[in-house]
Amino acid sequence: MLKAQKLTLAVLIQATLISSAYASEQSESKGFVEDATASVLLRNGFISRDKKNVAPGDDTSSWVQSIMFNAESGFTKGTVGVAVGVIGDYSFKLGPNKHSGNQMIPWENDNRSDPYNQWARGGAYIKARASNTTLTYGTQVLDIPVLASNTIRMVPEYFTGTLITSHEIKNLEVIAGKFTKDQMSDQIATDQNNLKRAYVWGAKYKFNDQLSGSYYGLDSKDALTRHYADVNFKQPLSADSSLTYDLSGYHTEWDKGASASISKYDDTSSDRSNNIWALSATYNKGPHTVMLAYQQSTGNSAYDYGENADGFQSIYLPNSYLSDFNGRGEKSLQLQYNVDLGAFGVPGLSFTTAYVYGWDINTYAYNNTANTTRNAKESEFFNQFKYTVQSGFAKGVSLRLRESIYRNSDSYAAIYMPDTNETRIFLDIPIKFF
């Protein structure tokens, strides 16, 4: 891993030295106050999971109101610019939420019987920028395939550490960072996941208007190493149609003693590893988009993420909905259809439907060998409407309605998730102050 980190650092240094060939972001800075921004996002969210064939009380539902804020100064002028910012959130539950869960509400105790009534979290960060390279230190929301913050619940997952992002070469982004704290969406303590230290590095490059690629790596102390790669090719077919191919995948190796869900591994092995990859083809014509995706997982472990402070959204693969279709040995196939209903007189409204089917899941379970099988199955039928106001005083307000119907084999339900009908309703109201 050290060789990869040194290579990334060398690329950052070389990119800085040749930055004169590309316009400088820092030279365009207007000032500490002049470029300052401040905004608030009001989010009302509801998630309900109706679980089948379970004991009374095992269903989970959560209803929460959150206020997320972000304020950031502009960069000071000069060769090296400095900026500061704060990020945070305040939330309160709506109703008793006695059976809450789903990473929505933190709990007062370990037996998950007493959810918080209200809670607040947050942090600060500082940035330094030279040319087109920015160093950020402090509390951050990460969008890195191998270390990605969960942003699909009420409030984001926060990481604390240092991240360098460089755009010194046109169409190339290079990153390198070190993080020492991880706070998930439903956690109060800033390092409740006990992250020791995680190094990340990587790059993405746009070769031309049709072809792009990326690679990212993660080395988390006493936990795991992970690599991710992606290649995307878009083939124009006509003025309003195209065909896009995408190949992506992860290779992960876990250290001995790393955390794991019982559904994810063969407990007879002390060396856990996994390869998971996906190939998709997406056809677009006007407002219509159809995607066909195949995904496959191999190794003595499933693709396990989030258990080791490695980001609860670190699965940049197409077959991820309520289930991620990432079981041990699993193969899955998805058919998805999306339509932009703006073309039919309703600007801002879209509809997505998808069906995913997974098979050949190895369900060996710790102390539960009666459920051993190599051909368990799962399926999910997904539907979502999303509407975003396009103009007027409410411009940017969005409403998302999502429903999933999930079913699986009894052997997989025993160690993963029972048959479940899930409903999600999220209303987002963004407010920009300056």
Question: For each of these PLM feature ranges, what is it?
Answer:
Residues E34, S61-I67, Q118-G122, P156-T160, ...:
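Residues that define the transmembrane beta-barrel architecture of outer-membrane proteins
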Residues N44-F46, L135-S149, V174-K181, W201-A203, ...:
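Transmembrane beta-strand segments that form the barrel wall of outer-membrane beta-barrel proteins
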Residues G78-V82, N132-T136, N171-I175, Q183, ...:
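Repeated loop/turn-to-beta-strand initiation elements of outer-membrane beta-barrel proteins
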Residues G299-A376, E380-N383:
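C-terminal structural cap/anchor segments
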Residues L2, L12-T139, V339, Q384-Q390, ...:
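Beta-barrel outer-membrane channel/assembly domains of diderm bacteria
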Residues V40, I67-S73, A124-A128, T162-S166, ...:
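Residues on the lipid-exposed face of transmembrane beta-strands in outer-membrane beta-barrel proteins
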Residues F92, I175-Q192, D219, S238-D324, ...:
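Outer-membrane beta-barrel translocator/channel fold
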Residues K51-P56, G95-S100, V146-M154, S185-N193, ...:
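Outer-membrane beta-barrel translocator domains and adjoining extracellular loop/strand segments
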